[in-house]
Amino acid sequence: MSSRWVEINCSLSLCRKVFAILKQKNPRQLPDKIDIIAYRENSRKCSIAKENKRLGMKDDDRDWVAHFDHPFLMTPHICIKQDFLFFPFDVPTRKKKYQGKAAPYWKYCIGNWILIEATVHELSHYVHIGHGKDFFKIYYKFLSQMAQVVISGEFYYWYSIQHQSTKR
């Protein structure tokens, strides 16, 4: 396995960890199972790839780094672009009035924080479709929970806590 895929798999495991933590904190708001996968152009799971292919469009859309799909009779999933998983660097979610304006360099986010933010954003779409007021309420709720978990240090030893609780 190339080092690029090692990085991508590490980022995917971090995103899955974010889902597991939020699922534990909000058991009724999130699904029991969700697949978090690296986006591939001709993926059978990704409905955006199917839709683009059906419409004759090329999968060259630069406007997104991740998207949430909940296809009929299938497990919901989040597809995240491979280059974003390899080098996580982007501007966090902004309200509509700030979109389209150039973001200053200090508003960019890199590393674990942007992976957490992107995962929280896509998980919020399970509860609310679109980017209205209700979406931002749930988005900020999930994001503040994750910030609290990271700042408290619980995020970094969360798997060991889960492992200990199953042994008892």
PLM segments and residue spans:
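Active-site-proximal or metal-binding-adjacent scaffold patches in catalytic folds
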Residues: 1-117, 126-168
